[in-house]
Design a protein with these regions (language model features):
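A contiguous active-site-proximal alpha/beta segment in oxidoreductase catalytic domains
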Residues: 77-134
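Contiguous beta-strand/loop segments that form the cofactor/metal-binding neighborhood of enzyme cores
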Residues: 148-223, 254-257, 261-274
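C-terminal helix-rich "cap/oligomerization" subdomain common to oxidoreductases
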Residues: 46-49, 95, 184, 266-301
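Mid-domain beta-loop-alpha active-site segment that forms a flexible
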Residues: 100-107, 130-161, 174, 283-284
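N-terminal Rossmann-like dinucleotide-binding module
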Residues: 1-29, 151
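Beta-loop-alpha module in the N-terminal Rossmann-like domain of NAD(P)-dependent dehydrogenases
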Residues: 18, 29-87
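A short helix->loop->beta-strand "cap" motif at the edges of active sites that frequently abuts
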Residues: 31, 66-68, 92-96, 187
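Hydrophobic residues in well-ordered beta-strands that form the structural core
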Residues: 35, 72, 97-99, 215
Length: 301
């Protein structure tokens, strides 16, 4: 739908294993349906893969072999070997691969990184109602992967230690996971993801030496709390005071945008103008490696 709204794309059609579903999409958006993926790939120079995670590798490799720039919805792949093979094939053919970590295009996060933050501690919470559609992978690859990606972009340092706990409740994989990442520069991140929540929540809290930022990625709002050294100069926004220090609160305004449109537009700009890809295959692999390490820690427990 968002690709149809973008003048950089000429949507040639859609492929779906389910012919009934494919016909419905074809009718709804007035695009051609292809029951043979090769016929569609022969008409394209770029593809968007929004299929179950277990199929990403096979479809992406086929697209690259047909000389198509490739957008792959998260998670990149279900194992590292496949992700590396996709990266290698794309590089050999001089093709672009973008991974669908959509929160990079969330206007709240984009606004936040404009402050050039220097985190010392981060905490993420990503809660969602149960959805059968995502249970081919655990909650780490389904939900937490977004926050791993965001945190790695905020703390571009190697991780020295990972610990994790999780539970399986409805599905055959982990539905609730908490992970702790300790970086070599002594920054720590605490991540929680659950797909068993009544209400959705996507929050990121970032603590710096003198600033605390609370990002609501779901409701597109942000508040920043700043430590002031002279409490006598406070204003009505002060929320705490102690001796000569105070903490003031400021709400940061954010303009709502369609993150999915922005994500696909960025993909098109990278193809047309060779604009750097925000989440390329290399970054996608780095995020996957941490996700799989969290899985490993859970299995050890």
């Amino acid at each position: 739908e968002q690709a149809l709204k973008n003048e950089n794309f000429n949507v040639r059609g859609v492929y779906d294993l389910n012919e009934i579903r494919g016909a419905e999409i074809s009718k709804k958006y007035n695009v051609d349906y292809f029951s043979d993926i090769n016929q569609l790939l022969n008409k394209c120079n770029a593809v968007s893969i929004v299929t179950p995670a277990s199929t990403h590798y096979e479809i992406a490799l086929k697209a690259l072999e047909n000389n198509c720039h490739t957008f792959i919805e998260k998670p990149f792949c279900t194992n590292i070997k496949h992700a590396h093979e996709i990266q290698k094939t794309a590089e050999e053919k001089n093709l672009l691969v973008q991974i669908g970590h959509i929160e990079q295009f969330n206007p709240v996060f984009k606004k936040f990184i404009s402050f050039n933050p220097k985190p010392v501690f981060l905490e993420s919470e990503r809660l969602a109602p149960f959805n059968k559609r995502g249970i081919d992978v655990d909650v780490i690859l389904d939900l937490m992967i977004h926050d791993i990606d965001l945190i790695l972009s905020l703390v571009p340092t190697k991780i020295k230690n990972i610990s994790a706990n999780g539970v399986q409740i409805l599905s055959n994989s982990y539905d609730l996971v908490n992970a702790r990442l300790e970086f070599q520069n002594n920054v720590t991140a605490n991540l929680t993801a659950s797909r068993l929540s009544i209400q959705p929540m996507r929050k990121l809290r970032v603590f710096e030496s003198n600033v605390y930022s609370s990002l609501d990625l779901n409701n597109l709002s942000m508040a920043r709390y700043t430590v002031n050294q002279n409490s006598k100069n406070h204003n009505e926004n002060v929320v705490f005071e102690l001796d000569d220090k105070s903490v003031s609160r400021k709400t940061v305004s954010v303009n709502a945008i369609n993150a999915l449109y922005e994500e696909l537009d960025s993909f098109s700009q990278s193809i047309i103008n060779r604009k750097p890809i925000i989440v390329d295959a290399k970054k996608g692999i780095q995020t996957l490696e941490i996700a799989f390490e969290i899985q490993k820690k859970l299995n050890e427990n």
